[in-house]
């Protein structure tokens, strides 16, 4: 009988990427088949996130549900990973003694050994260490799941913003070797992936070693990824303004594969609040980056993150945030009311903004950005947009659906052979959450760049350095 694995994932795109790697890894080592039904699984894994409020309580609530399954099947293995696991460690078992495996974001590659340990000894195991980049050399070859894919290029963050747990849960910044990243993307391109999203907690701080011992900057990596034949759309998430240098901005001038959409978190428009957050930049410096981006790529749309009601935030501070939103004209945002994260410097500050005031400010901010986004959508009416066709429409199986560079969903009439390819469509209707288009050009009528074939990248010889980190030499 096939053994089943169920993974529940909360949080960021990095967690989604990690969960996909867990599934691939345990599929290759133990033959586990992924299931959406927890009740039929032999192994249950919870990949957690500590960003949102009451993250720990959410974890224990879910584990309580799984305890009932463990009572019915004592051989069931329950594991907790991700950032809450990294924060709480063995303390998780103090409240949930039935948890068998506790692992951090940097030790998911050791899951096969951990599961073997539990099965062989009937005793729990905890591993929340930070073995730097080792995990990427222990993971199986990537498997494409549609025309888009996430690829992690670095982990951790050195910025230590006062509100953020990332440096404590994922460690400091470590970049994957450049050729390791290119090899993974080439493998995905050979399987039909057309769009890659490069991931990192501070992705534009990437500085990966090359096969000859040099350092590849993030700007250089973007150009190398875009040069792989078949990869015709490149995104990246998430960036920090103080690392958004002119050499990265210049890529927008000469690399058409890099999308005209950027997520660049600012958190607040108040310099006073930015200082308390230890963001190391001002609102004016942020706007200077945006101006340079618009000069390099006219029409680029910007999204951001905002924390509302940070300790000490006044009405005047909030009004400065609203002014920044109007000045930059953000297209979308991930915005939340502030809640303290245990172990961060901000958790020791007096949380003096009333909860109702936080919620009111959040409503005003989100309403402003929603209206701005709708204006951008209406401006697309009558224009021709290039979309990557991802599959059938959620609205009708008789139609197809894809996304524009600026992440708008477009539904249109098409043929199944268009799935996984690019088409140009004229936007004929604008709705709140989607657009409607008519096909005007198919991929065989486009002049997409061809530079380096995936096979030429894959053909590189794999080597390991003195600490066992893999790289690929031409």
Curated annotation (Swiss-Prot):
Superkingdom of source: Bacteria
MTTase N-terminal domain span: 3-120
Pfam family membership, one: TRAM
Record's keyword terms, sorted: 4Fe-4S, Cytoplasm, Iron, Iron-sulfur, Metal-binding, S-adenosyl-L-methionine, Transferase, tRNA processing
Residues engaged in binding [4Fe-4S] cluster 1: 12, 49, 83
Cofactor list: [4Fe-4S] cluster
UniProt entry tagged with the keyword S-adenosyl-L-methionine: yes
Enzyme class: transferase
CDD domains: Radical_SAM (cd01335)
Molecular function GO terms recorded: 4 iron, 4 sulfur cluster binding; metal ion binding; N6-isopentenyladenosine methylthiotransferase activity
UniProt domain TRAM: residue ranges: 378-441
UniProt domain Radical SAM core: residue ranges: 143-375
Binding-site residues for [4Fe-4S] cluster 2, renumbered to this chain: 157, 161, 164
Reaction(s) catalysed by this chain's protein: N(6)-dimethylallyladenosine(37) in tRNA + (sulfur carrier)-SH + AH2 + 2 S-adenosyl-L-methionine = 2-methylsulfanyl-N(6)-dimethylallyladenosine(37) in tRNA + (sulfur carrier)-H + 5'-deoxyadenosine + L-methionine + A + S-adenosyl-L-homocysteine + 2 H(+)
Enzyme Commission number(s): 2.8.4.3
Oligomer status and interactors: Monomer.
Function recorded in the entry: Catalyzes the methylthiolation of N6-(dimethylallyl)adenosine (i(6)A), leading to the formation of 2-methylthio-N6-(dimethylallyl)adenosine (ms(2)i(6)A) at position 37 in tRNAs that read codons beginning with uridine.
Name of this chain's protein: tRNA-2-methylthio-N(6)-dimethylallyladenosine synthase
Annotated source species: Pectobacterium atrosepticum (strain SCRI 1043 / ATCC BAA-672) (Erwinia carotovora subsp. atroseptica)
